[in-house]
Amino acid sequence: MTTVETVLGERFEVTTELGRIDLDVVHGWLSTDAFWAIGRSRETVELAARNSLNFGVVDQYGALRGYARVVTDQATFAWVCDVYVDPAARGKGLGLLLARTIVEQLRPLGLQRVVLSTLDAHGMYEKVGFIAMPEPQRWMLLAGPDVPGPGLD
């Protein structure tokens, strides 16, 4: 799937074709600048991408400007994660473009829940229909070894 949008006079494509998404760029972003993925290995980025629905924002010159992935069973549940926009392209609405495209792609699946975690983009996600978790006390987390606190170790 490829969607073409013009944002602030610039042409961008959102693609779900993994072959058009430069995972070296994604790895660079996530492993060095995304607080939730600092130090993530290139191998982990590739494995995660291969087992997810991927969304890449590509500019008119073919450069990757944004990325997100969705982990889903495509029947009841999806987790939106690793949402990242190139710092040089921020402020143009590319995060909103990614979020809107993801919602449009997931809606026909009839999922019961689509969840995500965000530190500072609540307002953007609300624009495409996300709400704060109504009963956060009902959710639990089994954290992995890189997450502070008790977990999988």
Question: Across the structure, where does each feature detected by a protein language model lie?
Answer:
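Conserved acetyl-CoA pyrophosphate-binding loop and the N-cap/start of the following alpha-helix
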Residues: 89-98
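Short amphipathic alpha-helix that is part of the acyltransferase structural core
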Residues: 1-40, 58, 150-153
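A conserved beta-strand-loop-helix scaffold within acyl/acetyltransferase catalytic domains
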Residues: 43-61, 65-84
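Hydrophobic/basic alpha-helical segments enriched in Actinobacteria
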Residues: 15-20, 65, 96, 137
